[in-house]
Amino acid sequence: MARALEQADGRWAWVVLLSSLVTQALTLGFPTCIGVFFTDLQRDFQASNSETSWFPSILGAMVHGGGPLCSILVKHFGCRVTMMLGGVLASLGMVVSTFSGSLTHLFLTAGVITGLGMCFSFQSSITVVGLYFVRRRPLANALASMGLSMGVTLWPLLARYLLETLGWRGAFLIFGGILLHCCVCGALLRPVATNEVPEPKEDPLLPPKIPTRSCLATCVSTIRYHLAFDILRHNMGFCIYVTGVTWMNLGFALPHIFLVPYAMHHGVDDYWAAMLMSIVGFCNIFLRPMAGLLLAGRKSLAAYRKYLFAVAILINGLTNLICTVSADFRVLLGYCLVYSLSMCGVGILVFQVLMDIVPMDRFPSALGLFTILCGVTSLISPPLAGLLLDKTNNFSYVFYMSSGFLVSGSLILGVGFYAAEKKKLKQDGQAKMENATSEMTPMHDLTSEDKDSAKKQPYPESIYMTNV
């Protein structure tokens, strides 16, 4: 995989950006429409809330949890092949899911296969933007994240229309054809010229001086490299980021799954209930470019991006409490408008902060470890919320749960980044003091002969104070 571009921010980079935007609209935006099918799937398979919730949880877990495998494919085959492979898998899973006779079959096809394909396409689209853009990277990430907003806007409306005309099986068949367009987006990622000498064919994990190595040791080294455990162990910022965002992810996806059923449960028309998520996406289409221009145009904000990210998560968590006040459509509409603002901040900063923390040559591996942890939380959170809903029959507790995870996750990030920055400043200050002390040799440690020789040296050569 190329790491240093010959023409960063070039003309073809904008074509790649468009490809990334469309790919994120197709992949990340799709899970937000699952709530439209929630009631029909529950009725057709005669399942409870917790059982039906396993479908979006498995889909979300695979979208995130396939990260390590995706990073291996990106390293060995590049983003182009990986994205096109993801498009084929995502389409195949949705088409085969139309023949599902039970929830188990649906979990395997539309959940596992489609989710893994979406993971390959979505993560490749993020990685390739970081490689094609350097100077305008914050703006590029913000524009690419518009894909999620467009997906959130269009997928629920399309899902509602197809559900009413073709049923959920026909809708899933159409979705399979739509997801195949990820292959077209991948074809646009043509190879990039670099200034770097091609890497040797030997595996860097197997030094040429070592003739033999056990299979187990090789597997362990490969896993450690592609899961970025070395970064997690030595990079405090990455450790804080992974901990906070993984914890936050336990509550972040819940409104996307349960908002539409919540509105329908309280008498809101099916069409207008599906429109709520589309309103969130529509607002983000305009908010994200403006936020991206703000971040890209002011370099002074670069040092505070991680704190802005924590604040956005905090606001997002507090916003979910609005749903507990009332289920009236006007209240939910206001909730969606406020939620859009905080979701915009989270969306444009989540990967930009990660790019600020880790070097780009290790970004695919760091993204793989981060996403597999988020995949675990995505697998746990919706069924847990569904079980809570079955026990209480009250949607308010689901939004309380979401708010609690988001607020606590923002505190982990904000306090953690602040403490790590203070610790680093303290260590840097101590290191400078030690260097200055070691460069100045005290006169009382010199012999009389050394003192005489020191006095005979020219004045300019007797001073070695430096900041380097």
Curated annotation (Swiss-Prot):
One Gene Ontology cellular component: plasma membrane
Pfam family, one: MFS_1
Top-level taxon of origin: Eukaryota
Main subcellular localisation: membrane
Membrane topology: Multi-pass membrane protein
The keyword Lyase is annotated on this UniProt entry: no
Biased amino acid composition, Basic and acidic residues: 446-455
Subcellular location: Cell membrane
Family: Belongs to the major facilitator superfamily. Monocarboxylate porter (TC 2.A.1.13) family.
Function: Proton-linked monocarboxylate transporter. Catalyzes the rapid transport across the plasma membrane of many monocarboxylates such as lactate, pyruvate, branched-chain oxo acids derived from leucine, valine and isoleucine, and the ketone bodies acetoacetate, beta-hydroxybutyrate and acetate.
Protein name: Monocarboxylate transporter 6
Gene source species: Mus musculus
Lineage: Eukaryota, Metazoa, Chordata, Craniata, Vertebrata
